[in-house]
Amino acid sequence: KQGGPEEMRWEEVALPEMQKDDVLIKHTAIGLNYIDTYHRSGLYPMPVPLTLGIEGAGIIIEAGENVKDLTVGDRVAYASPPTGSYAEAKVMPADRLVKIPDNISDEIAAAIMLKGMTVEYLVRRTYNVKAGQTVLFHAAAGGVGLIACQWLKAIGAKVIGTVGSE
């Protein structure tokens, strides 16, 4: 049932059958995003019943026979459909996963995937920022803003950030 958080329920559900290009992930951390609230409320209609969440991290516990670049035991993260990260485990197409570097925790990986994709879109695709350019970034203290400012600095851009409380 769609609605507020009071409509959420903890239930046992069967995982979908794995395909040859899928992996089974045991979640160790998940990301919480505005889009999850949109799915839950019905603002972005989704078929129900629904397991929320599009961002997570975990350990591969099973790999389909066609999966070559990932193996059981790999730490991976994702930010893409199908929904279902609000669960202990998830079947996921292997080509939608990235390995988590050893120096990044599962919690950080799960929390930055969607924000990082947003920043990549802004600083590489919307406008390909180059070293020496100046960028004004509003909401620099938010999740996207913090990643953007670090990314822009790494590129060599001069960053001017704005923040506010209202």
PLM features per residue range, with description:
Residues 1-7:
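Extracellular beta-rich ligand/substrate-recognition surface
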Residues 10-15, 57-59, 89-91, 97, ...:
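Conserved hydrophobic/aromatic beta-strand scaffold that supports enzyme active sites
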Residues 14-31, 41-84:
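Glycine-rich beta-strand-centered segment in the early N-terminal region that forms part
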Residues 76-139:
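NAD(P)H dinucleotide-binding glycine-rich loop of Rossmann-like/cofactor-binding domains
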Residues 119, 149, 153:
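Gly/Ala-rich phosphate-binding loop of Rossmann-like dinucleotide-binding domains
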Residues 137, 153-166:
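Adenosine-nucleotide cofactor-binding segment
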Residues 143-144:
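Hydrophobic/small residue at the entry helix of a nucleotide-binding pocket
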